[in-house]
C-alpha cells in the first residue's frame, strides 16, 4: 500500500513539474482565481446596478439554453446548438449555464464558437453567459470578466403589457457568499412583484450536496435549504442549472428546478 502511495505521489508530482498551459493539473485543483465575494464586488464595479439590459419580445417567447460546453479542441455540439439558435426567428436570446471552457486560455475559442456569423446565421441573437467552476480555474476569472463581463447580473424580457425578470447568480465556487446572497434576497424582496415571471440562471445546482464535482463541489446543505425555502416563498418561477452533467426536472413548493445535461462533445 505504501509503495502504491509513493508511486501515485511520484506520478502526480511528475505531472505537475512537466505541465504546460495545456496540462496544468495544479490549476485544476487549486484555483488561483479570486473568491466569490471579490467576484461580486468586481461585478458591481462593471455594472453598478448589475443591470445587463433589456430584451424585447412577445408575450409568449422562446429562448435557448445549454450547459457545460467545456470547449477544448472541438465544439461540434455547441456548433449545432449555435446554428439552430441563430437560425430560429422565434428565439429571443440564448443562455449558456457555465463551464464554457476546459483548458487555460481557451475562452476566445468558446466565444468564437458561440458567435454570430452572417454567412451561416440569420439572426444575431444575444447570448447571456453564466460563470462555472471550470471557468475560474487557471486564473480564468480575469479572462472571463474582461471578455464576457460580470458573474452576477440581471436582465429583463419586456413584452406588450408586462415583463419577466432573469437573474444570473455566481455559484462557481459552490456558494453565493454573504454579499451576493444579501443583494439577491434584497433585490427579490423589492422587485419580484413588478414582474410576471422570475427565472434564476446559475451553474451549480441547489439539490445535489454530495460533492459530485470533486474540487468545486456542490452547495452546502444548509445554504441550499435556506435558498430553496426563500425561492419558494417569493414566487420564483423557474431555476435553470447545470454542473452535474445529468438532466433532472424537480418541482418543489410550486417552483420548477431544471438541471441540464452537458452539451460538451464528450457527452454525445
Predicted region positions:
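Hydrophobic beta-strand anchors of alpha/beta hydrolase catalytic cores
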Residues: 63, 94, 166, 198-199
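Short acidic, glycine-rich surface-loop motifs adjacent to enzyme active sites
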Residues: 191-211
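Extended active-site neighborhood of metal-dependent phosphoesterases/phosphodiesterases
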Residues: 32-55, 106-197, 217-238, 246, ...
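Short active-site segment of divalent metal-dependent hydrolases/proteases
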Residues: 71, 101-102, 135, 206, ...
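Bacterial N-terminal signal peptides
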Residues: 9-17
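Bacterial N-terminal signal peptides that target proteins for export
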Residues: 1-9
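Active-site glycine-centered loops adjacent to acidic/histidine catalytic or metal-binding residues
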Residues: 68, 98-99, 132-133, 203, ...
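N-terminal active-site segment of His-dependent metallophosphoesterases
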Residues: 21-109
